């Protein structure tokens, strides 16, 4: 199991956050940067009801050079995909290769959000 947002974290590893905890933090007004690494097609099927920075992994060559201008290092970043695998890889990359410190992976991705938080978000 991956480390949680409230537990200890191994060095150079992102944290995992549940859909419920992320929703609670957003509802409490925390300024969390949401990054969605899914493809355009997936975003058209289901999306969070919050503003997200869309960085599809398949098109990383288009956005990687501007990454530091798009993400603030002093605010937490929550990364999501469909089920949490691609977002975990991206979160690890942010921490290990780019030195971001407050990086969370949405456990279970948008599918978990649909199940745990908002059944109005379609599952696919």
Put a short name on every predicted segment.
Residues 80:
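Short, surface-exposed ligand- or partner-binding patches at beta-edge/loop junctions that are enriched
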């Amino acid at each position: 199991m991956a480390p949680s947002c409230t537990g200890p974290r191994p060095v150079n590893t992102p944290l995992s956050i549940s859909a419920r905890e992320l929703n609670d933090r957003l509802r409490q007004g925390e300024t969390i940067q949401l990054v969605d690494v899914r493809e355009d097609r997936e975003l058209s099927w289901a999306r969070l009801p919050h503003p997200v920075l869309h960085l599809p992994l398949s098109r990383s060559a288009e956005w990687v050079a501007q990454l530091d201008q798009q993400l603030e290092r002093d605010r937490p970043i929550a990364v999501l995909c469909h089920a949490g695998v691609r977002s975990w890889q991206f979160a690890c990359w942010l921490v290990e290769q780019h030195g971001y410190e407050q990086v969370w992976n949405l456990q279970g991705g948008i599918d978990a959000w649909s199940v745990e938080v908002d059944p109005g978000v379609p599952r696919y």
